[in-house]
């Protein structure tokens, strides 16, 4: 569950193809839900990009081994040429900007909400903050289709949309728990 990517898909395929491997049944859930499933023993492993402290708080009392899989860049999906000149979370408060958010519980949303809090920015000042997409692909699609000016997600997804540019913000770590 949790996040998915080409690298993760390859790993899961190798695990199930191994002579001593078991079939891998995958469920796409946000980071909070997949860790909840792990905590209540409805899942055996979880892929997540939440930070280590968040992971440990969501599965208290359960011994975990975290396997660091890879780092990847996350940032803003914007129209080609970045006409709104978006470069930071502060720019999301511009009244001309309409944001497409991720759903509560996704690592992107958790990171963004934490960043807004650190910078003292109220979500009420961000037009579209309550608009939620369930994946990076759907949030990038919203910008591509001009339903929003900006969304926050993984750099790799921007490559699927020739009319989008990507503005990097930070790197996230993918873990297997």
Regions found by a protein language model. Name each.
Residues 69, 78-99:
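Flexible hinge/capping segments at coil-to-helix
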Residues 47-59, 140-170:
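A ligand-binding cleft/hinge motif common to bilobed small-molecule-binding domains
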Residues 68-75, 159-177:
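Periplasmic-binding protein-like
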Residues 10-21, 102-104, 108-129:
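Ligand-binding cleft/hinge of the Venus flytrap
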Residues 1-33, 39-43, 58-63, 84-89, ...:
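N-terminal hydrophobic or amphipathic helices and topogenic motifs
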Residues 44-45, 52, 64-74:
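Short, glycine-/small- and polar/acidic-enriched structural segments
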Residues 32-46, 132-148:
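Short helices/loops that flank or line small-molecule/ion binding pockets
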Residues 1-4, 90-110:
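Short loop->beta-strand "edge-of-pocket" segments that line small-molecule binding or catalytic clefts
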């Amino acid at each position: 569950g949790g996040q998915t990517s080409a690298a993760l898909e390859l790993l899961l395929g190798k695990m199930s193809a191994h002579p001593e491997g078991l079939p891998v049944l995958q469920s796409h859930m946000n980071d909070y839900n997949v860790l909840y499933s792990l905590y209540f023993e409805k899942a055996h492993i979880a892929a997540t990009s939440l930070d280590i402290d968040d992971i440990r708080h969501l599965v208290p009392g359960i011994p975990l081994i975290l396997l660091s899989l890879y780092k990847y860049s996350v940032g803003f999906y914007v129209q080609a040429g970045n006409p709104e000149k978006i470069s930071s979370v502060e720019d999301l408060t511009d009244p001309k900007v309409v944001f497409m958010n991720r759903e509560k519980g996704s690592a992107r949303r958790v990171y963004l909400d934490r960043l807004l809090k650190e910078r003292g920015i109220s979500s009420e000042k961000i037009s579209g903050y309550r608009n939620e997409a369930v994946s990076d692909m759907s949030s990038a699609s919203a910008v591509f289709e001009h339903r929003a000016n900006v969304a926050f997600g993984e750099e790799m997804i921007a490559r699927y949309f020739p009319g989008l540019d990507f503005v990097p913000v930070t790197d996230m770590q993918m873990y297997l728990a």
